[in-house]
Amino acid sequence: MNKDAMSKEEKKVTDRINELYHKKENEGLTPEEEEERKELHKKFLANFRAAFKQDVENMVILDKNGKEVTSEKAKQAQRKKGLRKD
């Protein structure tokens, strides 16, 4: 994910994950902090997967001759979102 495109909430989650990582490395985490770390990690992965899926679904693939070779699954997703008219 592009750091410039990261929302304030995503940045907050990432910063807190990093804080907890460094604390874990230096002094260890309390059980509550370990649980928080796990939940933040789940949230981070869900956000990452959603952004990645959106990027892939919006992608148009061309071969070296300029012919579109986008997968049918991606084309269907694009049609469903109104991004494609064919």
From Swiss-Prot:
InterPro entries: DUF896 (IPR009242). Residues 76-86 have a biased composition (Basic residues). Belongs to the UPF0291 family. It comes from the Bacteria. The keyword Nucleotidyltransferase does not apply. This is UPF0291 protein LBA1279. Residues 1-27, 65-75 have a biased composition (Basic and acidic residues). The lineage of its organism: Bacteria, Bacillati, Bacillota, Bacilli, Lactobacillales.
